[in-house]
Each structure stands twice: as structure tokens, then as C-alpha cells.
């Protein structure tokens, strides 16, 4: 079990304590860490909508350290990132794999970055299903539709051809921060502020 640090802030009304993530949210920083799943996606969507309502003209920063996860949960975050008015700055800290890499690339063009030792990995969606042959066929068709959608969006955000994306996501494709920049997943590698 991890302990979340508390931050004490002095105000004209006295002291106020926040958990570190709430304090950073005041600075328009959202942490996307761990597996992308429904509960996490709902929290991130809520934070995005809250920050938009606070000031639709100021950028929102999403720090990503994720091994990936659920496509539908990730698409809820992605669609909200594209829907709201503020620009979204994405920054890979540690790793952005699978859906994490997709969300990293989905930031506002020119505002996507990675730290020097970050790792990025893209691949095709994973799926598994058991049951009747007709149900397996339905799920296989759905995974192919999802694969096409993800590849289309990656091509849009990276500037790579759909053919290149299909080839490069056929198997796990790991990249350094510099390689992710050359590929178009991020716009810069940040060394210092």
C-alpha cells in the first residue's frame, strides 16, 4: 500500500492541506499512472472536464506512466481530450505503452513530450474470448474494427502512413524517447525545464 504525500499550503485564511495529486490538479496537472481501466478513466475524464470549466483557455498537462490497458476506457479519455477546448500537453514519464502510447500521441500537436529515459511501445489491440464459434467471430470482427480505428488515429497524430502504422503495430514495438520523437508520437524530448 502506498502513502500519498500531503502538502500544506498557507493562505490568507490559514493553512490548508491537500494530497499531492489534488494540489497538482490546481496547477492543471493530471497524472495518468498505472493500468488504463474504467475507474481511472472516469476520474481522468472528470478532471479534464473540471479543468475545462475552470478555464477553457489554459493548457492541461497529462503526465503519463502507464503499461496500457482497456481500449474502451482509453478511448473515453482520448475522446474527451479531443472534445474539450483547452490544449492538452502530454508528457511520458517512465513508460507509455499500448493505450498509454495512444493517449500520449493524442495530445495537442506541438505539445507532446517525453523525458529522456522514457519508453514508448505501440502494438495492435489484444483480445481473447471463449464461447460459441459465432460469438468468437463477432468478437474477432470487433477487435479488427478497433484495430483499424486505433491505427487510423495513430496515423493522423504521427503523420505516418496507415500502412506503416499497420506494419509497426503488428508486434510489440518499443521505442526510446528519441525514437518516439522521430516516429511522431511526441514532438520533443525534455531534458530540463
Curated annotation (Swiss-Prot):
Keywords attached to this entry = Cytoplasm, Hydrolase, Protease, Serine protease
Which coarse location class applies to the principal site listed for this UniProt protein?
Answer: cytoplasm
PROSITE patterns, A to Z: CLP_PROTEASE_HIS (PS00382), CLP_PROTEASE_SER (PS00381)
Q: What is its EC number?
A: 3.4.21.92
Give the SUPFAM superfamilies listed for this entry.
ClpP/crotonase
Q: Name the Pfam families for this protein.
A: CLP_protease
Example GO biological process term?
A: protein quality control for misfolded or incompletely synthesized proteins
List GO molecular-function terms, semicolon-separated. ATP-dependent peptidase activity; ATPase binding; serine-type endopeptidase activity
Q: Quote the catalytic residue positions.
A: 98 (nucleophile), 123
Q: Where in or outside the cell?
A: Cytoplasm
An example GO CC term for this entry is: endopeptidase Clp complex
Q: Which PANTHER family match?
A: ATP-DEPENDENT CLP PROTEASE PROTEOLYTIC SUBUNIT
Q: Which family does it belong to?
A: Belongs to the peptidase S14 family.
Tell me the subunit arrangement. Answer: Fourteen ClpP subunits assemble into 2 heptameric rings which stack back to back to give a disk-like structure with a central cavity, resembling the structure of eukaryotic proteasomes.
User: What does this protein do, in the record's words?
Assistant: Cleaves peptides in various proteins in a process that requires ATP hydrolysis. Has a chymotrypsin-like activity. Plays a major role in the degradation of misfolded proteins.
Report the NCBIfam families cross-referenced here.
Answer: clpP (TIGR00493), PRK00277.1 (NF001368), PRK12553.1 (NF009205)
Name the UniProt record assigns to this protein: ATP-dependent Clp protease proteolytic subunit
Species in which this protein is naturally found: Haemophilus influenzae (strain PittEE)
